[in-house]
Amino acid sequence: MPRSFLVKKVKLDAFSSADLESAYGRARSDLGAPLHDKGYLSDYVGPSSVYDGDAEAALLKGPSPEPMYAAAVRGELGPAAAGSAPPPTPRPELATAAGGYINGDAAVSEGYAADAFFITDGRSRRKASNAGAAAAPSTASAAAPDGDAGGGGGAGGRSLGSGPGGRGGTRAGAGTEARAGPGAAGAGGRHACGECGKTYATSSNLSRHKQTHRSLDSQLARRCPTCGKVYVSMPAMAMHLLTHDLRHKCGVCGKAFSRPWLLQGHMRSHTGEKPFGCAHCGKAFADRSNLRAHMQTHSAFKHFQCKRCKKSFALKSYLNKHYESACFKGGAGGPAAPAPPQLSPVQA
């Protein structure tokens, strides 16, 4: 904590005001009450007696008002603690200065851990409450005796009955069979595709993936009204329809784009900005996708291999450039190799 936030000197009991002191002195002399050695009234003054005007009855030699802590609380500590002196202050070094001031130079800032200022949000509390609610039924079912499930008179026997009249057992078995379908979550909580075996974390992602297994001749396939391209995946078709709506236009060259981030990346070609740099070699790129493609060149996995010289490449575009090099033009005195086969878009 900065030192500017620390209070250097604070006056304790020396508040002085001429008007307040004079008014207090006049009232003290009018009452005629005895004073304590520290300057305050030692006896309790009954307000009813003062208001009635009885000066002699104004001084009540009765006990003082009730203390802040009840006597029963003090008695619980034992008879030895009841008459003991109050404990000393825990920080006596702060009040050693003369005149009743706190010595701010001797004060030390208290340090707190980060957990002391951490306040959990509603999601953490809801997660904890849901976890507790889920643990309660499992604990109750584990603690139930085995005799309750065998047809006893309780509600547990009726819900878990396995006989012909046990509706609970029949419905539970049907639910288990329904959950054990081809798209159900496995042991690891993943949802597997029944056709290709690919797994997904959520059932919605699995249902979206299943659209890719549809045939182009299926009734669920949709055709683009602009270009006639057929799609079996509705999210893919929705993204394709945006390519026909070129509403984002470059103000420099007039080129239009379907998405604003594509226009933003295009503007870097005019400004020369390359904010995406490679951490391995320092090469910079204007687009993040180009950086991701470049990062594959530093990977140990190079899946594209030249059929002649057996040289491997991480990107297919690098392999195509290698096909156009001297290796396939009969360089180094060797015979010219045949042109690389043209792959269809599906094989690519």
Curated annotation (Swiss-Prot):
Residues 1-20 are annotated as: SNAG domain. A zinc finger (C2H2-type) spans 191-213, 222-244, 248-270, 276-298, 304-327. The keyword Oxidoreductase does not apply. Brain specific. Keywords: DNA-binding, Metal-binding, Nucleus, Repeat, Repressor, Transcription, Transcription regulation, Zinc, Zinc-finger. InterPro entries: Snail/Krueppel_Znf, Znf_C2H2_sf, Znf_C2H2_type. It is found in: Nucleus. Residues 130-189 are annotated as: Disordered. One of its GO terms (cellular component) is nuclear body. The keyword Nucleus applies. GO terms for molecular function: DNA-binding transcription factor activity; DNA-binding transcription factor activity, RNA polymerase II-specific; DNA-binding transcription repressor activity, RNA polymerase II-specific; RNA polymerase II cis-regulatory region sequence-specific DNA binding; RNA polymerase II transcription regulatory region sequence-specific DNA binding; sequence-specific DNA binding; sequence-specific double-stranded DNA binding; zinc ion binding. Residues 130-147, 173-182 have a biased composition (Low complexity). GO terms for biological process: negative regulation of transcription by RNA polymerase II; regulation of DNA-templated transcription; regulation of neuron migration. Belongs to the snail C2H2-type zinc-finger protein family. The N-terminal non zinc-finger region mediates the repressor activity. Interacts (via SNAG domain) with LIMD1 (via LIM domains), WTIP (via LIM domains) and AJUBA (via LIM domains). Transcriptional repressor that binds E-box motif CAGGTG. Can modulate the action of basic helix-loop-helix (bHLH) transcription factors, critical for neuronal differentiation. This is Transcriptional repressor scratch 1. It comes from Homo sapiens (Human). The lineage of its organism: Eukaryota, Metazoa, Chordata, Craniata, Vertebrata. The gene is SCRT1.
